[in-house]
Amino acid sequence: MDMQETTTACADAFAELASPACIDDPYPFMRWLREHDPVHRAASGLFLLSRHADICWALKATGDAFRGPAPGELARYFPRAATSLSLNLLASTLAMKEPPTHTRLRRLISRDFTMREIDNLRPSIARFVAARLDGMAPALERGEAVDLHRQFALALPMLVFAELFGMPQDDMFGLAAGIGAILEGLSPHASDPQLAAADAASARMKAYFGDLIQRKCIDPRHDIVATLVGAHDDDADTLSDAELISMLWGMLLGGFATTAATIDHAVLAMLAYPDQRHWLQGDAAGVEAFVEEVLRCDAPAMFSSIPRIAQSDIELSGVVIPKNADVRVLIAAGNRDPDAFADPDRFDPARFYGTSPGMSTDGKIMLSFGHGIHFCLGAQLARVQLAESLPRIQARFPTLTVAEQPTREPSAFLRTFRALPVRLHAQGDSPRLTSAFLNGQRGVEGGASFEHGDGERRSATDRRAQP
C-alpha cells in the first residue's frame, strides 16, 4: 500500500502490517488508518481500532459492551483451537478471563506483583545489568561490534525471569528460545507451519512448568512460583496446576520479548537524541519519563492479540461493529494519535515527567501496557528493568553508536529486532543516528550511510524535528 498515493480503501490491515514497508516503518500506514479507516474491518472479519479514544474505551469497557470469548465458543474466534495447544493456553490466561473468574485469579497473583515486591528485585536486576555490560566491554574496547540485542536486550529479561521463577538460568535460556515462535503462531494471520512451531515450543514450556511446580511443592523457595503454589485467599481458594502453568506461560510470553524490544528502542533513542540524554542523568523521575516516552513512541506489541467480543451492535466513527464481532486494538497507532499526544512523532520525555506511570502531563494514557482490568501485570517489572539499564549503559559506554544497519524481525505483531550491532566510536568519528531512523528511515549523520531498500547508498536526512 503506497501512502503517497490517494487511497480509498485497505482490504486487510493485518496483512498490510506484515508487508516489508510496514516492517520498516508502520507509522505512515497507521496514520492513514486513523484518518481514513479508524474502525477497520479486515478480510477475516476482525475489526481493528486505531484511534486513541476508541482504543481506551474498548479496553476499559466491560459488561454490556465487550467481553472475552467464552470457553465453549473458542473455536469461533480461533478456528484452529481444537488442535492447537498454544491457542488453548492463550484462552486459559488471565488476559482472556472476565469477572468473576478474572477477579479471583488477579487477586491471587497481584500481591506478588506489587511495586514493593518488584522493587525488591532491583538489586538483582542491577547486578545482572552490570554483569552483561562487563561481558560486552572487552570486545567494544577492542573496537569490535557487539550485538546489543542478543548480548543485552534478550539476555536481561531471561536472567530476571529465571530469578523471578526460581529456576536455573540455562533452563530459562532454553525456554526463551521458543517465545518468538509462539508469539508468531498466535498472530491472526499465522500459517499452519507457524502454529505448529508455536505448539512445539508451548509443549516444551508446559512440560517444564509442570515439573517446576512439582519441585516447588516439595522444596519451596522464595520465588514467585513457590509463592503462587501456596497462594490462597481468605476462602482458602488456591490456584490449580493448570491455572499455574497457563499463568507462567502467559507471564513469560507477555514480559520477555516485549521488554527486550523496548530495551532496543530505548538504546536507539539514546543514540538518536543525544540532547535528551540528560533525562537519564538526573533524578528517577527523569529516567521514568524517558522510559514512558520510549514505550509510547514504539509500542513493542503493535496490536492486541486478545479478542474483545462485541456484546451488541456498537457504532464507532460511523461504523457499526456487529454483535459477536472480534475486535482488536492497534496500540501503536493510538500511542501516536495527535488527538491524544501533541506532535506525536516527536520524542519528548517531558510529556511524562512528574506524572503517574503511563499518564502524560495532559492526562492521556500511554497504551503499551493496556488499560482497564486487563492492564499488564508485569508493567512495573518491565519499567524497573529499563530504569536500571539505561543510565548504566550511558555511563559505561558514553560513546556507543550503531555499527551497521540493525535488522528488524519481520513480524506484524512485535516491533523488534534480529540484531542491533553497536560499537564505541573513536574521537572525531561520531556518527549519530537520526530521529528518523527510529521511524523506519535508515541512516546516520556524520558522513556515514546505510544501504536503502532500492540498493542506493546515501546519507540520511532527518524527517522529524529534533527537540
From Swiss-Prot:
InterPro entries: Cyt_P450, Cyt_P450_B, Cyt_P450_CS, Cyt_P450_sf. Residues 444-467 are annotated as: Disordered. GO terms for molecular function: heme binding; iron ion binding; monooxygenase activity; oxidoreductase activity, acting on paired donors, with incorporation or reduction of molecular oxygen. Coiled coil: none annotated. It is an enzyme of class 1 (oxidoreductase). Heme binds at C376. Its EC number is 1.14.14.-. Keywords: Heme, Iron, Metal-binding, Monooxygenase, Oxidoreductase, Plasmid. Its cofactor is heme. Residues 451-467 have a biased composition (Basic and acidic residues). Cytochromes P450 are a group of heme-thiolate monooxygenases. They oxidize a variety of structurally unrelated compounds, including steroids, fatty acids, and xenobiotics. PANTHER family: CYTOCHROME P450 YJIB-RELATED (PTHR46696:SF1), P450, PUTATIVE (EUROFUNG)-RELATED (PTHR46696). Belongs to the cytochrome P450 family. This is Cytochrome P450 BJ-3 homolog.
